[in-house]
């Protein structure tokens, strides 16, 4: 140890240096400032500068329109809410605004008008319902009509109903003028059962009138019920109609009698309905049954 020990080296100086370095370390007098290289690189990167610039561009500035510009735009919107490119360019030259701004203004204005129409239309639909008056469609419901007009209307309706119920009011043949004489003759000669039975036909007609049947149909009803009366009627009318024989008026066979009755009905009724045809068939069947009996 003594060989390597330097006598000129002072131990006190070494201790003093150690104490100074400790004090400097404690009080941070000569301490180096360390910086983070990554953070310094991130702050100085150009990408962050670009993103900040883009965020600044995204924030648009709102265009403030003057009163003159708004009046011109509103006037153009009243003319047409969908202006073409030529009209937008003219408005841009007139209002000193870019054409893109004018296009955006028209889009916003159309949206506002559609929203206002949706809010106004329910109110406008409900309001005229209070003032509307419903006209009287049916004449009977109109209370302001006079009683004379009501009477004439009822008379017209009754006439229409009568025309509908009577399909052939104009084709009715007149009553035979010889019928009263025949009835009187039948009343005088009431000894035979056929004449007495035939004279009862007018009373039956009075008791059971047929408004839709003519006199010929009524005569045919009586003849069907009383065939003897038909023979007496034909014998009395032979003097008036000498050209017609009794055999032609009253055939011997029942089938020919049916044909004669049908011919007589068809001559008076050229147009017959299904109901009349069925009545004729039924009456012809009754006549044949009476003849067979």
Curated annotation (Swiss-Prot):
Listed InterPro entries: HD, Homeodomain-like_sf, SEBOX
Tissue: Restricted to the mesendoderm precursors during gastrulation.
Presence of the UniProt keyword Endoplasmic reticulum in the record: no
GO molecular function: DNA-binding transcription factor activity, RNA polymerase II-specific; RNA polymerase II transcription regulatory region sequence-specific DNA binding
UniProt DNA-binding residue ranges: 58-117
Key words, A-Z: Developmental protein, Differentiation, DNA-binding, Homeobox, Nucleus, Transcription, Transcription regulation
Pfam families: Homeodomain (PF00046)
Segment forming the signal sequence: none
A Gene Ontology biological process term: cell differentiation
GO cellular component: nucleus
Main location: nucleus
Localization (cell): Nucleus
Keyword Transcription regulation: yes
Induction field: Regulated by the Nodal pathway.
Region annotation Disordered: where it falls in the sequence: 117-144
Gene3D superfamilies: Homeodomain-like
The protein's role, per its UniProt record: Probable transcription factor involved in the control of specification of mesoderm and endoderm. Acts in parallel with bonnie and clyde, faust and casanova in the Nodal signaling pathway.
Similarity-based family: Belongs to the paired homeobox family.
Name assigned to this protein: Homeobox protein SEBOX
Organism: Danio rerio (Zebrafish)
């Amino acid at each position: 140890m003594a060989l390597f020990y330097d006598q000129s080296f002072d131990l006190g100086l070494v201790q003093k240096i150690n104490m100074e370095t400790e004090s400097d370390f404690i009080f941070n007098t000569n301490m180096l400032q360390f910086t983070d290289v990554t953070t310094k690189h991130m702050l100085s990167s150009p990408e962050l500068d670009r993103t900040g610039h883009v965020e600044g561009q995204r924030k648009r500035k709102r265009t403030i329109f003057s009163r003159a510009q708004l009046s011109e735009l509103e006037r153009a919107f009243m003319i047409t809410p969908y202006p073409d490119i030529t009209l937008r360019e003219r408005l841009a030259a007139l209002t000193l605004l870019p054409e893109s701004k004018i296009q955006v203004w028209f889009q916003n204005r159309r949206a506002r008008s559609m929203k206002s129409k949706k809010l106004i239309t329910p109110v406008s639909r409900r309001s005229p319902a209070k003032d509307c008056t419903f006209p009287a469609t049916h004449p009977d419901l109109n209370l302001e009509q006079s009683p004379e007009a009501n009477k004439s209307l009822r008379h017209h309706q009754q006439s229409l109903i009568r025309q509908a119920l009577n399909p052939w009011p104009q084709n009715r043949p007149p009553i035979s003028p010889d019928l009263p004489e025949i009835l009187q003759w039948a009343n005088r000669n009431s000894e035979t059962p056929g004449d007495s039975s035939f004279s009862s036909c007018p009373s039956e007609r009075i008791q059971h009138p047929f408004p839709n049947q003519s006199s010929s149909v009524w005569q045919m009803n009586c003849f069907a019920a009383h065939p003897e009366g038909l023979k007496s009627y034909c014998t009395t009318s032979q003097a008036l109609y000498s050209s017609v024989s009794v055999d032609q008026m009253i055939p011997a066979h029942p089938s020919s009698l049916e044909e004669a009755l049908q011919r007589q009905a068809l001559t008076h009724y050229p147009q017959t309905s299904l109901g009349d045809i069925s009545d004729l068939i039924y009456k012809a069947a009754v006549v044949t049954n009476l003849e067979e009996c």
